[in-house]
Amino acid sequence: MKAVRLTEVQHPLQLQNIPMPIIGENDVLVSIKAAGICHTDVHYRAGKSPVHPLPRTLGHEIAGTVEQVGKHATTYKVDDRVCVHYVLSCGTCYFCNTGNEQFCVQGSMIGRYADGGYAEYVSVPQRNLVSLPDEIPFEQGAILMCSSSTAFHALRKSRLQGGETVAIFGVGGLGISAVQLAYSFGALDVYAVDINADKLRLAEKYSAIPVNAMSNDPVAEIRSLTHGKGVDVAIEMIGFPQVMKQAVQSLAVMGRAVIVGISERPLEIDTYRELLGKEAEIIGTNDHLLQELPLLLELARRGKLKLSDAITHTVPLDADAINQALDNLENFSSDIRTVIVP
């Protein structure tokens, strides 16, 4: 089968012909109909986050149909529409038993430590599949598995209450989902912070209040818009320490900042003025949980989460096209999500 693979860090991905995956007794072979291209894959290609062993087929946002099932995989049948939960876990350790499988002691990840979705087929454990409703296109089902689910988990971690205000720093693939989901969680006002006017216009379409960080100090603008109070929840989705600091500085008394973006650099804050003095919190978040996916999919099925505008491009299973999409993400272009349609 065809697969676009990372063969060496800091080098373009390569199209290769590789053997079809072999499924185990509890596995399912999925025929990939759509695979999202995530900013995390930019980090993998650049060598900022380890991927091993190489070569590796990237891609952790996957939707498709069941092609074949293992002997003991009885939940799904051939041609069922499915999405793939990319966090591989043992199901028996302390973290799995407490519903925090992203910290599984034997944990792994599809598209990083196991071959992923930049291919025609992928083999996954049956327990990592969720049914994809007929109302949701494969392209949207794919990006629900990372960009939307990560946003959903971050909002849950924020403990957002009805009537509170939220600022989303970065309205790309994750942020445009976070804007919509925040209203589903009961937010009164959602402020969308970005430097890209196109992304801000899209966020405004979903009832966000735009804050252009290119032309204004976003912290001062949020303070002004909230009559000096600040926001109850700020979610940082870029991965720049400067933006993380702005998220913390924009908080109201007893506000919570959730850090989603990945950075290799430290975050420096005024500990008393920005944290202790107003009993603010900084919350880290990591991936998402399998138990969160059914509600997320139902919100999408009901039209509470609209993703058609979030998919700015589709590309074939072609190395040049995929590398170009990764380049665009690396350069923070206007693209929100590019999806591979094999």
Task: Outline where the language-model segments fall.
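Mid-domain Rossmann-like dinucleotide-binding core that forms the NAD(H)/NADP(H) cofactor-binding site
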Residues: 134-216, 220
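Glycine-rich beta-strand-centered segment in the early N-terminal region that forms part
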Residues: 21-35, 48-94, 133-136
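C-terminal hydrophobic helical "lid"/dimerization subdomain
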Residues: 245-249, 290-342
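Glycine-rich cofactor phosphate-binding loops and adjacent beta1-alpha1 units
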Residues: 158, 201, 206-281
